[in-house]
């Protein structure tokens, strides 16, 4: 039998699979009486431009650009016809390499209109990483500014495509020996002409009447199940994998994210300091806003805490997005108190474990009474679990929420067995949101997605009796100390209770006797400079298990924590830096790690869930998010 728990009134329900048995399995299915959409990204842009043509869709504060839905649609059509004029067709891959700019949005929706596939390229990539990105998916056209911050994009392209500098200025057609699919380089700079590069401002003027007719024909042929976006994802280590997402994947995920957040109910102005190249920015941000006819505010080309605070104040933003690190930097900015945040009533926190103390501050100081936590991965378009606004605040931050509508999820052991609720295992997801594949990586796709379409997230989670899930860590981040399993998130959550700790990250470092021991990176508040390592250990003694107390404590500054562009901490880099700083590079454990409470073999063969038959549609990492177990309100 099923027990169905309403979400948001009568809009959707959760199946808790409460079979008449003593042990309930860690499986949920997001039943819903709201149908999936069968639209393309282009369909939704045209619908928005028809319904609210004069409403502002995107605001880029730093560049002084404000565009309505009708204006964006017009610009997207000009951009698409320009690409068609250059010879691009349906299915061709178009790389977008750069920070948050209006041209990024035009590329996102313009390529979707024409049935082309946009490839998101990390703004921090250097020449070797760009080379891999171009080769892996066969990019035909690349769009980028001349550079950003310390990166010289034009020099990087010239480095891997030397033919570039042999071309005339302002001419971007290309035939490269190293990149046989590559044909055009388009540069976003009106002030200067570059050898081997078209000016973006010229490309959007190239389209002829014949090109416009062809665009209309191409648009009619685009299907919801066609790929629309390739997002390179490797978590925080390893070679990038091209997660291939369809219109159906991202349109529906954005739609149900917005419904659960209440965007379909009232006017919403979303502050998006997150990078557009990441799912948080381009699916939860721009596409979500488009589908629900709302407005996105982009404070700066990349995250700047002061710019975000100013944007909230000046644009009267109602919702703010961010990772915990972003919110910490915003709340602790010396000019934080200068601005008015009374317009804010909601926000999304995702990207890393969210400390209870931070959640409390977001509600009490920034006004996020409808704060919601999200969990998912790029491969799931991205959100799989999300808080429900009807839950009390203290319940919302105990977990990553409920399964999204129309999705299934299970927690399994290392052999694929669905575990009882309350036991830790790997989180699996199945449904419309699961990516099509990793582009041109059949073996890798088979490793991550089982034949019956269960996607292995690589995250360790526990399902509670009410069907919500808490993420306790990544399989690869698990610390095994003499057979005892230590989940970094648990130690981090405890240490965050210390009133003088502003940020903390836990990693494992090698130890001869135990195999691994705990190392803590700690950032103290300004007034806490006299705190010692022993003070931290004393804070832990008698409150957490002795084997979880950090052996090593490294006090760090704000800039010392290595972050990805999307705000995730690079734990693998922290581990390596810790070993060097502590002189542990040559340490070899004298014993093999033995199985403790529950140990994962990261390389183990992956299995679909077994022991229990899981039914459902086989249709078909942004966020490693969790919260603690304290109450939000004391």
Predicted regions and their residues:
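Structural core segment of the AMP-binding/adenylate-forming
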Residues: 2-10, 116-202, 526
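Conserved AMP-binding/adenylate-forming core of the ANL superfamily
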Residues: 33, 37, 57-109, 126-131, ...
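Conserved adenylate-forming
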Residues: 86-88, 207-226, 230-272, 284, ...
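AMP-binding/adenylate-forming catalytic core of the ANL superfamily
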Residues: 125-132, 142-144, 320, 431, ...
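Conserved C-terminal "lid"/linker of ANL adenylate-forming enzymes
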Residues: 184, 479, 505-511, 519-523, ...
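Gly/Ser/Thr-rich phosphate-binding loop
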Residues: 202-206, 317-322, 331-395, 408, ...
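Conserved AMP-binding/adenylation subdomain of ANL enzymes
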Residues: 251-269, 279-319, 329, 333
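Conserved ATP/PPi-binding loop(s) of AMP-dependent carboxylate-activating enzymes
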Residues: 402-406, 417-448, 484-486, 581
